[in-house]
Amino acid sequence: MNFDAVADQQMTDRRYFALEVAESDDADSSLNSSSMGSPAVDVGRKVYKITSHKGSAEDESQSFFTSSDSPTSKTRPVGKTIENDDYYGKRSSTGSSLKQLFNKININDTAHSSNKENVSQSVLSENKLLSPSKRLSKQGLTKVTNSKFRTPLRPISNQSTLSRDEPVKDFRSLKFRSGSDFKCWGDEKTSSHVHSSSVNSVNSFTSTTSSSKWKFWKNDNLLSRSLSSRSVNDQDPNFVQPKPTNSLQKKSSISSFHNSIFGGGKHTEKKRNSGFIMPDHQSTKELNHKHSSSNLSFRSLKHKTSHSSLNKLKVRRKGNTQELNHPIKKTCQISLPVPDQVSKDKIQLKLKNSTSLASLSSEVTPINTLDYNDSILQQILQLCDVKYILHDLREAQSLGLFTLNTRSVQLSHNFWQTYHSDMQTSLICKKVCLGALSDLTTSNLISLHELKSLRLIQGTSGVANLLQAYVVPSNQCENDQNLILYLFFKYQGTPLSRCSNIDYSQALSIFWQCSSILYVAESKFQLEHRNLTLDHILIDSKGNVTLIDMKCCRFLNIDNNKASYTRLDHHYFFQGRGTLQFEIYELMRSMLPQPISWATFEPRTNLLWLYHLSSSLLKMAKKAVVSGALNREENILIELTHLLDPARKHSKTIFKKELVIRTCGDLLSLKGEIMQ
């Protein structure tokens, strides 16, 4: 065996180990001092010359190269420093120059208490072989610096750094728990280059920090690259890493920590091979950017699950304006089922028997709004005396029609009193604006309904007789396209709302006249006035009563036997509160069958308006009478009001017949009994 080559290789490795620990300036000074043979002492670094116990270099060489079979020769264990040189044989001649350099290096691993993360103290045994030098004297407690890690430029005394690096020591203790692993490496002699001191320091860290808690997976972004073991990366490639325990396999961040420490890329591998050690803060940044496989899988899963829902939300929010070409909208296609012939027949049969307005048997058909208005206007013109629209009032005068003049007096919002020049008689003119939005109580359809009712009941006593009707443009402004319907009646007196000084006898006369008129119209045409206010009752000088304004009435058309009515579900009829008039509207709607059908004939609605009339007459007569004494007419009027009161409770009598009033005919049949 060539012992010279082995000794030279060990000495060369030991020299590389020492040069890596010492700083460049201190190393140069040490080399200069060793070449001069002077025992240079560096007080700041605590480097002392170690004197040899042997006399000559030849004896050292001979003792170093002693055969391995001799009892005094022992194998130097890997990872232990040299404490006693007496057990080695002869050394080579080339090691004499290196001996002087090693004698100047104090192998000291004593660390300050605030710098525990960089250095460690290892107490060595005297019975173990520590160095390839053969003639070094026996020293007590010789120490070796952790030559694998560079000495920091300034001492680290921050306690947070100590707590940050302690988990790394625990992890290293997991990998290398006992010193037997290192002995196996030395016995196999397969390692090309093993740094014993660094491995020993890691082993010492394991013994001192074995009681610390394992929380390094929570602070993996704070790990220092400087504490990663380079000796592990430089170890034998055939070495099999020990598997982690089952408890650590359950932690998802163990894999990320292992990959960040042992799975370095090409860039970090080049730095390690070149002897460059990355600073702590730079390595921390690199480890901070490395994510574990569990975190990456969780993020990708979260992104996949939320991607489709976000796209659907965008489609709903943005609508059809911005997402016409969206791929999701292209796939969202709805296919409607196509019914067979049997299903079609069933649907048609149900629609024919349906009572809805859109049923197949209904006469209601879809039509354009303009066409609908033109159709209503043509029907109005057919009921007028002039079958076309006049240009202006001058044309009406030329045709001999009644017109409004300067002597006309406005009685109400729509009624005027005028005089004819030839007849010297007064007339009542009703002015209706067709298609105007200002008056919600009128429309083309309502005007048509009123014209039909007037033409139907014309000649009936107590109802205003229509004399003339025609349509003229408004001409209030240049762009005005509204039409005005003029209705002329014979003068029948003034509205009851404007009358004053009415006594109880006159009040009773007005009440019974209105009841008789409604009874005739009710019996003949099934007519319900449905809007008999004081303005729609005219009183002449002789006390005769005339009913006007039939736009809200309901009647039966004799020609086609169909009911004609006006819907009273508009909010205009129910917007008032606190007055008896609007309470009557509510009571009328409650009397109609549910669902509400305004075409149903309900004669009790006329009784409701007679109750409204008796209550109003009772108040008006009290104001006119000065004396406080009650008379007979007043008692009768009070009794009528009580009988027509819809809130009256029917008394249960045995010997007296209960008065049941459901129509105006029933009320008139009780007239003789009430007036007695």
Curated annotation (Swiss-Prot):
One of its GO terms (biological process) is DNA damage response. GO terms for cellular component: cytoplasm; nucleus. Gene3D superfamilies: Transferase(Phosphotransferase) domain 1. Residues 62-75, 232-259 have a biased composition (Polar residues). Serine/threonine haspin-like protein kinase involved in cell cycle regulation. PANTHER family: INTERLEUKIN-1 RECEPTOR-ASSOCIATED KINASE (PTHR24419), SERINE_THREONINE-PROTEIN KINASE HASPIN (PTHR24419:SF18). This is Serine/threonine-protein kinase Haspin homolog ALK2. The lineage of its organism: Eukaryota, Fungi, Dikarya, Ascomycota, Saccharomycotina.
